[in-house]
Amino acid sequence: MATTKSFLILFFMILATTSSTCAKLEKMVTVLSIDGGGIKGIIPAIILEFLEGQLQEVDNNKDARLADYFDVIGGTSTGGLLTAMITTPNENNRPFAAAKDIVPFYFEHGPHIFNYSGSIIGPMYDGKYLLQVLQEKLGETRVHQALTEVAISSFDIKTNKPVIFTKSNLAKSPELDAKMYDICYSTAAAPIYFPPHYFITHTSNGDIYEFNLVDGGVATVGDPALLSLSVATRLAQEDPAFSSIKSLDYKQMLLLSLGTGTNSEFDKTYTAQEAAKWGPLRWMLAIQQMTNAASSYMTDYYISTVFQARHSQNNYLRVQENALTGTTTEMDDASEANMELLVQVGETLLKKPVSKDSPETYEEALKRFAKLLSDRKKLRANKASY
């Protein structure tokens, strides 16, 4: 009798724990963030292809897409382009691009996008081909049509303020319901590289609203993870299904942040003696590299510290290559040879350990994330069916 009683107590304890875990997983907000970095977007594209493949395998569904699993997908610069590709609907209201289509997109269009304009007074590239291909691929689709919440950053040089394009903010700011191709060009219009982008939308009163935008990296300095988390928090607070989530409650966030690679630990370091001889132009190029590397590091440091403080370190995964060398460090080298190298970087990165203190590889960590994303999606689907 005592044995039976003990068994029943243990059974109900396990049942209660399982129910609690399922409830927490069901209410978890899932976030994908993709850095900027020009042609180096090939690196996170490789990671996205692997993750989407894992989701298709876990759910036994070849039509599974990343937008089906993430509440918020955010990106800046080339990361904004990737965000649009995997969230913009086609005629069947499914993402117009699968993750496996992204790398071929770079190979086909990258050499034309980064085709030197020959101008000595304007930007290095005229941006005409980039805008043309974005118009062809994204059509007349606007922000409100995105298949999940998006967070794509840009910076308005006329108002001197960041501009964040999200679905959830359209009720308050309908002028932000811009065409996706305008948004994508704007977030990629890096100073020095591409011309700023001007376009108009309309306010709720029908008045013209002007945008004068440049690269989202000016606003988020390359890593939009904090921006994406902020949008996810606001989204959660406005959705009754997530009413239990408090502001920036990272215990109920699942964040995957994808970098485009840095060289901060290896190549292109400088001495004070070298820098003392630089002119303004040399400083401009170096500062951009330094700022991007430093910002990426500090954003990762802050987020990982907060997740650890909340005992939720397994809810955050930063996938980043810190050992880029040679041509792979350049955001505009779209030669076939360099793009092949970037593919190799991404594929090799999957086999590397997440940290020096953990034997878990990025590949294993992404498989773990895929299982969590799949389980959470199934829990929500089951609840919705009742």
UniProtKB/Swiss-Prot annotation:
Location of the active site? 77 (nucleophile), 215 (proton acceptor)
Keyword Endoplasmic reticulum: yes or no?
no
Q: In which tissues is it expressed?
A: Tuber.
Task: Give start-end ranges for motif DGA/G.
Answer: 215-217
Could you tell me the EC number(s) of this protein?
3.1.1.-
GO process terms (BP) = defense response; lipid catabolic process
At which positions is motif GXGXXG? 36-41
Pfam name, any one: Patatin
From the UniProt record, list the coiled-coil ranges: 321-384
Q: Which UniProt keywords apply?
A: Coiled coil, Glycoprotein, Hydrolase, Lipid degradation, Lipid metabolism, Plant defense, Signal, Storage protein, Vacuole
Q: What is its main location?
A: other
Q: Extract the GO molecular function terms from the UniProt entry.
A: monoacylglycerol lipase activity; nutrient reservoir activity; phospholipase activity
**GO CC list:** vacuole
Which residue intervals define the domain PNPLA in the entry? 32-229
Annotated motif GXSXG: location in the chain?
75-79
Q: Where in the cell is it found?
A: Vacuole
| Secretion signal, residue range per the UniProt entry | 1-23
Misc note: Patatin have a dual role as a somatic storage protein and as an enzyme involved in host resistance.
**Comment, domains:** The nitrogen atoms of the two glycine residues in the GGXR motif define the oxyanion hole, and stabilize the oxyanion that forms during the nucleophilic attack by the catalytic serine during substrate cleavage.
The similarity comment for this entry is: Belongs to the patatin family.
| Function text | Probable lipolytic acyl hydrolase (LAH), an activity which is thought to be involved in the response of tubers to pathogens.
What is the name attached to this protein's record?
A: Patatin group M-2
Record the organism.
Answer: Solanum tuberosum (Potato)
